[in-house]
Amino acid sequence: MRPAEQERPPFWQRRPGLRVERHRATMAHLASVYPCHTDASLGDRGPYIGVNVTGGASGWFFDPFELYGHALTNPNCIVTGDIGSGKSALVKAFLRRELAVYGRRRMVTILDPKGEYTPFAAAHDLPVIRLHPGGTDRLNPMDHRGERTETHRRQNLATALVSGVLGRALDATEDALLGWAVSTLARTGRTFTIADVAATVADPADDLVALSRRSPLELAQAATPVVFALDKLLTRTLAGMFDGPTSVRVDWTNGPGFVIDLSAVYDDEDALPLVMLAATSWLAASLQRHDDRRVLQIIDEAWAAVRHGARHFQGSLKLSRTYGVSTWLVCHRPADLSAQTDDGTAIAKISSGLLSDVQTRIILRQPPDQVPVAAELFSLSERERGWIGQLARGRALWRLPSHGAVVQTVLTETEKQLCDTDTAMST
């Protein structure tokens, strides 16, 4: 309590200083002004990311595999932010530090639709697989991975690709015919390609005709849309990229990883989602055959990967824990993962449901119209909702199941040149 006015000594006898009123408050409020307050963050295991702005400027360290089992129950991440928010720099700096901290215990695979990871790949000895129509590098999304469910995976992939070309779901006969073709080829035990699937559909074996309970002419008529769709995939959309056996060699045992450059088809809005679907399928099948290393899988422009293959892609995410793969979905807006099929259908619900398989949400600055969308998708508090529209460049809200913090990514001078896309463009 402040002493009564008559009890105060004359001003020449008073000690210098500022008289402060007594105030009582809880630590929930005082933590924001108390200079010695720090947040334990997530511990110090994993590479250093930056400064925990909401935790007294303590360090922020992160590795999805180190946190698995106590802070996380799945290793997948989503990174979303407006253009120029520092999204690309954060991801590249994280990958660079993962390779520096863990060496060959980590493998980095990057699906790069825009071709912006080429300098990063050169600096870290990551080979670049450049896919373009008429090229020499080919990946076979029908490659076998030795699982009992392999036939089912390949059937789903074929269905997703053909549905994407047709722009509609397959009817019962089309779906059955395509499934029969894949299972027939799978039973041979030999490696087959999409071209083999097309040939089998166009000229079905007698047992397939008998199984369909239709005449050869009726079956041929029913199969016509599928035949034309597969022909378009092989002669245009996937030509020279996914129409033959895998021709690239990857060091799965000791190599640091690789980049798949899809920039040749980035401007083709019809082809890019199908190419992304085929590439992610090949990547998932390959990674699941080599499960002795922890893998960081980056899917840039993730909206394209789920546009036609949400169900197929969700299946891969669910297997991340089994095969030691942390998938990072990178997009401008969180709504990108659901807006492609936001029509109330089962596929739309699956697209939105992808977020349930992603426990680490890294949200950089959002444009005003996306703040309500992000708040709903990520179940943000009112305070967090206010933050994400005002975050400074390089600053992100990290949301984990039991922890949340605003973190400023800290870049070295080398990383600013190598990882920061905007800096590289301005120099």
Each model region followed by its residue ranges:
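Structured core elements
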Residues: 48, 61, 78, 109-110, ...
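Switch/connector loops and helix/strand junctions flanking conserved nucleotide-binding motifs
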Residues: 117-120, 137-140, 336-340, 370-374, ...
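Basic- and hydrophobic-enriched, low-structure N-terminal and domain-boundary segments
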Residues: 1-80, 414
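Short helix/loop capping segments that flank catalytic or ligand/cofactor-binding pockets
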Residues: 60, 70-72, 88, 119, ...
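P-loop NTPase motor domains
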Residues: 31-54, 118-127, 133, 140-325, ...
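Glycine-rich phosphate-binding loop of nucleotide-binding enzymes
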Residues: 47-133
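Conserved P-loop NTPase motor cores
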Residues: 72-85, 92-96, 111, 263-387, ...
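P-loop NTPase motor core of the ASCE superfamily
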Residues: 150-196, 342-427
